[in-house]
């Protein structure tokens, strides 16, 4: 899957699929916003977009290259928002996600953390958006999961946030963990084209956390299960220990129980 959907200037200017490798060619010189899709698309989606001038109504396969965590400022203070970034980075560290697997950004108001899919190994499918949303919601408390919907997009780096007039810029982990919010804001007054990007890498560290169970649409109107355990945890308990994945399964169940207040 080699295509991403882009929107130039406004999230409303959608429906144009371009090669991911050529995304930089569409970066406006004046810093105007450029958005890209969360998901990757194949030739069938490209043909659909060409015919319909939109991806609305497309329910085929989607892939993903990076999983983005959106830490939005909302009505919070800049100090609190930066603290949330650092707490999330600490949580990733406890999950044994390596530094070389993530890239931090200041978005112009809040922060983005990009995790390479090499950490998860999500496979392309028509149910991928649901899998990503469920997986990330289970791993991270109070996460804004709306970005993982089928039509999710986000602004690319070196473009301006039109409300603050600050650029989305990449940050090193040292900067993210040690700089004040004011220092970060000062850096974001200009794009950061000179940033030394490195290719993100991973070794399936969080593959065992992926939620693969997708409820059928017709089941959504039915009465829910009497238990409040999420579907992927139900499946793990039902299947029991599986050779080669028992450690990851145990960690996932323990993490879920801890988040839901079950004492250790």
Language model region names:
Residues 65, 98-100, 109, 152:
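Core residues of folded domains in eukaryotic genome-function proteins
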Residues 101-108, 145-149:
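Short beta-strand
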Residues 1-67, 71-85, 149-153, 158-199:
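DNA replication initiation on ssDNA origins
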Residues 93-99, 138-141:
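Secondary-structure boundary elements
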Residues 48-55, 96-100, 235-240:
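Short amphipathic beta-strand starts and helix->beta connectors
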Residues 121-142:
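Acidic, His- and aromatic-enriched active-site or binding-groove loops in soluble protein domains
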């Amino acid at each position: 899957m080699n295509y991403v959907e882009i929107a130039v200037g406004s999230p409303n200017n959608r429906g144009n699929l371009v090669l991911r490798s050529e995304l930089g060619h569409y970066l406006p010189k004046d810093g105007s916003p450029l958005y890209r899709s969360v998901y990757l698309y194949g030739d069938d989606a490209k043909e659909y977009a060409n015919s319909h001038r939109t991806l609305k109504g497309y329910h085929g396969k989607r892939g993903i290259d990076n999983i983005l965590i959106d830490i939005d400022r909302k009505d919070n203070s800049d100090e609190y928002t930066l603290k949330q970034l650092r707490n999330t980075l600490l949580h990733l560290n406890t999950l044994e996600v390596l530094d070389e697997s993530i890239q931090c950004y200041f978005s112009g108001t809040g922060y983005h953390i990009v995790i390479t899919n090499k950490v998860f190994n999500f496979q392309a499918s028509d149910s991928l958006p649901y899998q990503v949303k469920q997986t990330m919601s289970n791993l991270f408390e109070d996460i804004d999961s709306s970005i993982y919907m089928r039509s999710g997009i986000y602004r690319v780096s070196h473009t301006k946030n039109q409300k603050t007039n600050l650029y989305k810029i990449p940050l090193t982990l040292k900067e993210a963990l040690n700089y004040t919010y004011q220092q970060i804001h000062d850096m974001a007054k200009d794009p950061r084209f000179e940033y030394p990007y490195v290719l993100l890498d991973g070794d399936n560290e969080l593959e065992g956390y992926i939620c693969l169970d997708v409820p059928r649409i017709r089941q959504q109107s039915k009465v829910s299960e009497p238990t409040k355990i999420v579907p992927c945890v139900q499946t793990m308990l039902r299947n029991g220990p599986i050779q080669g994945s028992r450690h990851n399964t145990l960690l996932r169940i323990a993490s879920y129980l801890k988040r839901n207040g079950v004492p250790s």
